[in-house]
């Protein structure tokens, strides 16, 4: 067998990686991966972190790849470099080298790594790599049924509408950038201040339209404004919202599914629930 090399994906590798991932994930097709890699090309990762991710190369062609979506994110007064590991695939004949991709990816220091869509059979592998589960399930909410009588004075605005009360400019950037990625970005406006929300349109089992909560300041804010937000999302024909959760969420009508869509992290800062900003769900649309 020819020598195996593991290195960063370069721009010249994009056509080969597109074909590799289209073969590895045939349900998505080449056009999806062309778009995904174009999104990564358009981003500016933090200094020292890869633009696309890493590949395994044999005899001059890619035989494995993992994408890294890297961002500098702010949580309160702190800032952290975060990388979402995504779309890990290695051709069957080279599976014994698959760990090289992970070890190279995890070699960056002072970075919090996320794995937010692992297949169930990989959970023990992920945990052996030092990842910890921080979200154990999801709550599927019907927010339009909530807050029918307790949310007067709240206005829901498209993020492109400038708020007239206090807001955080960094959150405005998050909403604008995610709207450009195809997400639904909203402000909930009270007389005192604004509250940011980002949702990704999805389909449950490829059939039922819903919205996935990508970003909010606190899940409690979503509970507080569930009614107005839910009624706004009904305009998009999305009656359900999927929220990361470790237990049923008081104040929301819906169903908690423990063990569904668990999230893992490794690094200096555990992500909070309600923050999937700049991850594969938003950037790639997986």
Predicted features and spans:
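Short amphipathic alpha-helix that is part of the acyltransferase structural core
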Residues: 1-41, 84, 137-176, 284-286
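C-terminal functional modules
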Residues: 259-286
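A broadly used, surface-exposed interaction patch
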Residues: 47-52, 61-95
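A conserved mid-domain beta-alpha-beta active-site/ligand-binding segment of alpha/beta enzyme cores
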Residues: 145-148, 152-216
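A short helix-loop-beta-strand connector motif used in the catalytic cores of GNAT acetyltransferases and
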Residues: 40-55, 175-187, 236-237
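Core nucleotidyl-transferase/polymerase catalytic module
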Residues: 48-49, 54-56, 69, 120-124, ...
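Acyl-donor binding region in acyl/amide transferases
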Residues: 76-140, 207-262
């Amino acid at each position: 067998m020819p020598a195996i090399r593991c290195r960063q994906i370069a721009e010249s590798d994009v056509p080969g990686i597109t074909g590799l991932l289209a073969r590895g994930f045939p349900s998505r097709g080449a056009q999806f991966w062309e778009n995904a890699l174009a999104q990564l090309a358009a981003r500016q990762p933090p200094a020292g972190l890869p633009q696309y991710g890493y590949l395994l190369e044999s005899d001059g062609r890619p035989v494995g790849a993992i994408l890294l979506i890297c961002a500098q994110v702010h949580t309160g007064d702190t800032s952290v470099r975060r990388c979402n590991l995504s779309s890990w695939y290695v051709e069957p004949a080279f599976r014994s080298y698959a760990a090289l991709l992970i070890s190279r990816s995890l070699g960056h220091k002072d970075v919090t790594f996320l794995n937010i869509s692992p297949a169930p059979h990989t959970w023990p592998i992920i945990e052996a790599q030092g990842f910890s589960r921080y979200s154990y399930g999801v709550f599927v909410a019907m927010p339009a049924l909530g807050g029918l009588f307790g949310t007067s004075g709240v206005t829901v605005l498209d993020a492109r509408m400038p708020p007239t009360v206090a807001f955080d400019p960094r959150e405005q950037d998050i909403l604008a950038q995610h709207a450009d990625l195809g997400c639904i970005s909203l402000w909930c406006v009270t007389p005192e201040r604004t509250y940011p929300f980002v949702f990704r349109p999805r389909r449950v089992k490829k059939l039922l339209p819903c919205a996935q909560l990508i970003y909010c300041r606190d899940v409690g804010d979503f509970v507080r404004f569930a009614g107005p937000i839910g009624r706004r999302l009904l305009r998009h024909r999305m009656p359900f919202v999927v929220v990361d959760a470790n237990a049923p969420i008081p104040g929301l009508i819906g169903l908690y599914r423990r063990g569904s869509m668990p999230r893992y992290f490794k690094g200096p800062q555990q992500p909070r629930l309600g923050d999937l900003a700049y991850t594969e769900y938003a950037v790639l649309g997986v």
